[in-house]
Amino acid sequence: MFFTQPPHLVKAEELKQEPPKGTAYSVAIPGTEQPGRSRVYRAWNAQKELLTTLDPQVTTAHDMFESTANRQPKNHCLGWRPYNSTTKTWDPYQWLTYETVQKRRAAFGAGLVELHQKHNCHRPGQYGVGLWAQNRPEWQITDLACISQSLYSVSIYDVLAPDATEYIINHAELNCVVTSLPHIPTLLKLKSSLPNLKMIVSLDPLDGPEQNGHSKRALLESMAAGLDLAIYTIDQVEELGLASKRGYNAPSASDIVTINYTSGTTGPPKGVVLTHGNAVAATSCGLTTIGQARGDTMCSYLPLAHIYARLAEHTAFWGGARIGYFHGNIVELVDDLKLLKPTGFMSVPRLYSRFGTAIRAATVEQPGFKGALSRHIVAAKMANMKNPDPSKATIKHALYDRIWAKKVAAALGLERAKYMISGSAPLDPTLHNFLRVATGTDVVQGYGLTESYASATAQSTQDLSSGNCGRLAPCTEACLVSLPDMEYSVEDKPFPRGELLLRGNNMFREYYKNDDETSKAVTEDGWFRTGDVCTVDAQGRFIIIDRRKNVLKLAQGEYISPERLEGVILSELGYVAQAYVHGDSSETFLVGIFGVAPDLFAPYASKVLGKTIAPTDVEGLKEHLNDDKLRRAVLRDLERVAKKHKFAGYERVRNVSLKVDPFTVENNLLTPTLKLKRPPVVKMYRTLLDQLYGQANEEQSAPRAKL
């Protein structure tokens, strides 16, 4: 069956094209430089005007979904795997059509307004609805429902600690939280500290075959008695909306689409106010980077409370793709991927590193013919990719892709994937290139922040370089500002270096109820200070080289970027699942606390110690992590990595402690997006860090035997 691509997708393909020969991806606009500030950069095809939308008729997230639902109502939209209580397994995917989702979101949106009126919480203008659940179809139905009535969602990370949940609900003044069943008891316990909360809407059924008084609803309502708090299910609210006959109250481009609370690595979360105009601009750029179309499939597993995942689903909706949700267990994600066979995949370096480790173990590290053939294929494809003639460079190979790379991709469920995208942290160049040749798939790296609606830069699928974040999105402009205290200058040669500043149609409005933080983050002329230190190469590609906010200064005055070192270590040592590199200002070297991956570290430890430790024997592994033989073996690996990446002497980790899961969301050392909270890590592990320094200093001062 043939169909015509809608005009906005045709325009996206046009904007996706490579620049003319001799033109950089991002162009410095003459005459825009200022003292201490570089020229302003824009995408080569947006030099005159930044992109606002791919379709003048589409200016809101409401429009994006409606245009697709009206164009292809019978197509698959949202999919999930039901749990089979008989077999204790997850069934194949079931799907809701765009038409069904459209009707349900309209009913639920109307019902939410009716509910607020019923409890005397409805007020003129916009207000927020809390959304606290793991990725699932009802998450998007709720978000789309809010949008349909000019309400905005306030997402709460599924794994957020109770104190942070309490802070967000109170700060955003939420009267209603839509949530999954496991979170309802937590909300009931917190109710005494949540004066504004009047309604909870459960995404899960509360009525079952239990006897009277023993249903989930009865138990929860008994807990809620006297708390001035009503509990409903999504079905009840949808029925309320249908009965109301209430139509859409569509938003405008300047209306809020969401308040997205940042992870809060150093303090309380900040509420990033994002508008419908921001959403449309960022989604337009997403479609110019990767494209989405009818017949495409994406897998949703990255937390939807993170704007990176939300942008991905906006892009799927406006492109006409379908979204299949993982069944909730990240360890079994590949099972979902093998069923879905997505046409594209978005992830983070941490997962790509595990993919790379698994692929190497199954191919190039195998003994005998299988390993030899794999190494030959990787070497041949790597040579093709690095062909000095860009017109001949390719990750494809007519024979090797068919007999080898296709099988590698299929083992991950990614044999249909046209692209893989990495974001949220730098992707190691060696891993980047290996994934390209091993899977035969375009792997691109992007850069964005919550404040930029996850959109700022992205590599072209035709650009086979690595170690950079690619070109500017056509909705965004950028410049660099000198940092004299860190010895970065926009006058540096061969390329300018400085803090990256962003401005554009995708950029946030403000931090909610926080003028002080807003004024710190945004200059008077509208530039957002990212805190990331960048350079821009001759092709107009942006490269993150440092982080202004997380720089250590050692005793002899050397500046260290621990996040850069941690990223390299995580990508090189597959058995390291978590890495924290620490430097005291009174010391001349670094120490580290590493969390090991039991399934990968157990074989390594068995080899070093000469005894068998089963990958599933986590407690047994923990007993051996303090063995000095293991510590010294890991330090040798760290030294090898340091030499390979040409770390300076003061950048080398001289002592290390090995643990299983030392940093978790539950112990408040990780944000919900799994970023380290560095000050709390130091506070919790201060004694251990002192011991690591003491041990290393003793070992360095101990006399060495002469040979």
UniProtKB/Swiss-Prot annotation:
Pathway: Secondary metabolite biosynthesis; terpenoid biosynthesis. InterPro entries: AMP-binding_CS, AMP-dep_synth/lig_dom, ANL_N_sf. It is an enzyme of class 6 (ligase). It catalyses: (4E,8E)-10-(4-hydroxy-6-methoxy-7-methyl-3-oxo-1,3-dihydro-2-benzofuran-5-yl)-4,8-dimethyldeca-4,8-dienoate + ATP + CoA = (4E,8E)-10-(4-hydroxy-6-methoxy-7-methyl-3-oxo-1,3-dihydro-2-benzofuran-5-yl)-4,8-dimethyldeca-4,8-dienoyl-CoA + AMP + diphosphate. GO terms for cellular component: endoplasmic reticulum; membrane; peroxisomal matrix. It is found in: Peroxisome matrix. It comes from the Eukaryota. One of its GO terms (molecular function) is polyketide synthase activity. Residues 525-549 are annotated as: Fatty acid-binding. Acyl-CoA ligase involved in the biosynthesis of mycophenolic acid (MPA), the first isolated antibiotic natural product in the world obtained from a culture of Penicillium brevicompactum in 1893. The peroxisomal acyl-CoA ligase 891 converts the intermediate MFDHMP-3C into MFDHMP-3C-CoA which impairs its diffusion from the peroxisome. The first step of the pathway is the synthesis of 5-methylorsellinic acid (5MOA) by the cytosolic polyketide synthase mpaC. This is Acyl-CoA ligase 891, peroxisomal.
